[in-house]
Structures are given as C-alpha cells and as structure tokens.
UniProtKB/Swiss-Prot annotation:
The gene is rplU. Keywords: Ribonucleoprotein, Ribosomal protein, RNA-binding, rRNA-binding. It comes from Mycoplasma pneumoniae (strain ATCC 29342 / M129 / Subtype 1). This is Large ribosomal subunit protein bL21. One of its GO terms (cellular component) is ribonucleoprotein complex. SUPFAM superfamilies: L21p-like. InterPro entries: bL21-like, bL21-like_sf, Ribosomal_bL21, Ribosomal_bL21_CS. Belongs to the bacterial ribosomal protein bL21 family.
Length: 100
C-alpha cells in the first residue's frame, strides 16, 4: 500500500513501515500522530483530499539538517558577511493506513 500525504506545504509519497522526514512538528518523540490530508491512497484519488482517510505515523526523532553556509560579498567595498543555517526536521515512521 502507498499514499500521497500533505504535511506542511509539501507532498510525500509514503509506503507502510516507511520512514520519512518532514518540517519540524510540535509533537513529542514516541507520540502517534495522524495525517488526514491524504491526496491518494492506492488507486483512490481525492478531490482534493480523500474523505475519512488517514495515515497514522509515530514520531521517531527531532533533529537539525546539515549546515548550509551562506557568504555575501560586496566587491570593491571590503565587505564580507558569512552565516550558516540548519533547518529543523521531524522523522516519522508510517504505522498504518486507515480508510473508513
């Protein structure tokens, strides 16, 4: 089984017992969450979402992605600005698909 779900503003193709990374969610590690914005479940396609369809996931961990370094340089002004950014994420594991 597979599904396409919306979490945040992104779409993810997920399979059963699959792990995937989403933008940071405010949920403790080990908590079971339900993603109810399901665009597609197997061959059923929603308009835009499927009614009464959910993907049940467990929060495995929170973390930070690899650092992205940014350098801004203005030529002939002797100006150099350097900073970095690490985007937070949440790792989810799909437990089951529910469709009533």
């Amino acid at each position: 089984m597979h599904a396409i779900v919306v979490c945040g503003s992104k779409q993810y193709l997920v399979h059963e017992n699959d792990t995937f990374f989403v933008e940071k969610l405010e949920a403790p590690v080990g908590k079971e969450i339900q993603l109810d914005k399901v665009l597609m479940l197997d061959e059923k396609i929603g308009a835009p979402y499927l009614e009464k369809a959910r993907v049940v996931c467990v929060v495995e961990k929170h973390g930070l992605q690899r650092k992205v370094n940014v350098i801004k340089h203005i030529s002939q002004k002797h100006h150099l600005k350097k900073y970095g950014h690490r985007q937070p994420y949440t790792k989810l594991k799909v437990v089951r698909f529910v469709h009533d």
